From Swiss-Prot:
Protein name: ATP-dependent RNA helicase RhlB
Family indicated by similarity: Belongs to the DEAD box helicase family. RhlB subfamily.
InterPro entries reported in the protein's UniProt record: DEAD/DEAH_box_helicase_dom, DEAD_box_RNA_helicase, Helicase_ATP-bd, Helicase_C-like, P-loop_NTPase, RNA-helicase_DEAD-box_CS, RNA_helicase_ATP-dep_RhlB, RNA_helicase_DEAD_Q_motif
UniProt keyword Hydrolase, yes or no: yes
Residue ranges with Low complexity bias: 402-414
Positions occupied by motif DEAD box: 165-168
Gene Ontology cellular component annotations, sorted alphabetically: cytosol
Species of origin: Escherichia coli O157:H7 (strain EC4115 / EHEC)
Described purpose of this protein according to its UniProt entry: DEAD-box RNA helicase involved in RNA degradation. Has RNA-dependent ATPase activity and unwinds double-stranded RNA.
Group of enzyme by EC: hydrolase
Length: 421
């Protein structure tokens, strides 16, 4: 398959419902990405799909296009009740559910189908008010969906389409029992269109597809290369004492337009945030302890460009559609090999190039061999001159609880620090 981001296949070439094509073209979507070109012929023919593709390759639009087309082309059951959605899209995190909902809104506006959103943390009554008026497509996280179902606010007996996004992450977060609970309350698999999409399709995910789908077709895009070919990967071996100064020096040298820094723990993320905020960077903090409204605001500020750097745990590593991320820093090498792929997949998206920089410190260097085995190649190593690391650094800011902590706007040019060799 061509390595280009878009294929020659156009959405208008398929027998899609005219309103769906109109909505796509209005948003500037004309040509399909590889995963869309593979999925749509199957879903339009009523076949179930389990799809694997690198993040940022259009999985969301593949299943949204299929969902809207199916609902427009097949009427709802005759005795459908107001609390019965016709399609259910399940996501592992609140942020991903919100982003899927945002991506679906232009299609909903063009087609007249109603959207609902259900996620935990806040907004219970607001979400419920929308559901009580009746929705066609319900997007949500499993916990809140089960809550509404147990109270009979929603009934899944009229489901015509079901989507499971980031299925491997569902397993990682322990949601698989919830998913099975929801599936048991839907019509049989052969009476609905089933789609499962993820950046990785492990054995356990395939087992779930076998259980809950109707003879699904497996489709894959570039499975032989787990890390995007547009991403420049780079690895440093700092001591624990030099690690923070190396990160700050690299940021000054690279001066990224939009960067995400990943660390393995909430405490480490707070520490990184404190150093960067004190040094005048516009930096946001995203961990599981940050309140939901604040998390969404931080993501919005980062997406708009009001923040240059986002420091995050792996809560932000999967599924989030943040455009134009130029750099990803792995301050800590992840314990899970798949998380490395998902982290660096935040950059190099939508045909753009990206830069991933990883720090293999004394604490996490032991994770490197498994990561390199998993991705199928060694990460190129760069050296640095310890004497050139930044030393004129302010005392880090401290916080008693996670908050956004925007530093002042960066001014002037970056300090001229160069690496060795």
């Amino acid at each position: 398959m061509s390595k280009t981001h878009l294929t020659e296949q156009k959405f208008s070439d398929f027998a899609l419902h005219p309103k769906v094509v109109e909505a796509l073209e209005k948003k500037g979507f004309h040509n399909c990405t590889p995963i869309q070109a593979l999925a749509l012929p199957l879903t339009l023919a009523g076949r179930d799909v389990a799809g694997q593709a690198q993040t940022g390759t259009g999985k969301t639009m593949a299943f949204l296009t299929s969902t809207f087309h199916c609902l427009l082309s097949h009427p709802a059951i005759a005795d459908r009740k107001v609390n019965q959605p016709r399609a259910l899209i399940m996501a592992p995190t609140r942020e991903l559910a919100v982003q899927i909902h945002a991506d679906a809104e232009p299609l909903a506006e063009a087609t007249g189908l109603k959207l609902g959103l259900a996620y935990g943390g806040d907004g219970y009554d607001k979400q419920l008010k929308v559901l009580e008026s009746g929705v066609d497509i319900l997007i949500g996280t499993t916990g809140r969906l089960i809550d509404y179902a147990k109270q009979n606010h929603i009934n899944l007996g009229a489901i015509q389409v079901v989507v499971l996004d980031e299925a491997d992450r569902m397993y990682d977060l322990g949601f698989i029992k919830d998913i099975r609970w929801l599936f048991r309350r839907m019509p049989p698999a052969n009476q609905r269109l089933n789609m499962l999409f993820s950046a990785t399709l492990s054995y356990r995910v395939r087992e779930l597809a076998f259980e809950q789908m109707n003879n699904a077709e497996y489709i894959e895009v570039e499975p032989e290369q787990k890390t995007g070919h547009r991403i420049k990967e780079e690895l440093f071996y700092p001591s624990n004492e030099e690690k923070m100064r190396l990160l700050q020096t690299l940021i000054e040298e690279e001066w990224p337009d939009r960067a995400i820094i990943f660390a393995n723990t909430k405490h480490r993320c707070e520490e990184i945030w404190g150093h960067l905020a004190a040094d005048g960077h516009r930096v946001g903090l995203l961990t599981g302890d940050v309140a939901q409204k604040k998390r969404l605001r931080i993501l919005d500020e980062f997406t708009r460009g009001d923040l240059d750097i986002l420091v995050a745990t792996d809560v932000a590593a999967r599924g989030l559609h943040i455009p134009a991320v130029t750099h990803v820093f792995n301050y800590d090498l992840p314990d899970d090999c798949e998380d490395y792929v998902h982290r660096i997949g935040r950059t190099g998206r939508a045909g753009a190039s990206g830069h991933s920089i990883s720090l293999a410190c004394e604490e996490y260097a032991l994770n490197l061999p498994a990561i390199e085995t998993y991705i199928g190649h060694s990460i190129p190593v760069s050296k640095y001159n310890p004497d050139a690391l930044m030393t004129d650094l302010p005392k880090p800011l401290r916080l008693t609880r996670p908050r956004t902590g925007n530093g002042p706007r960066r001014t002037g040019a970056p300090r001229n620090r160069r690496r060795s060799g």
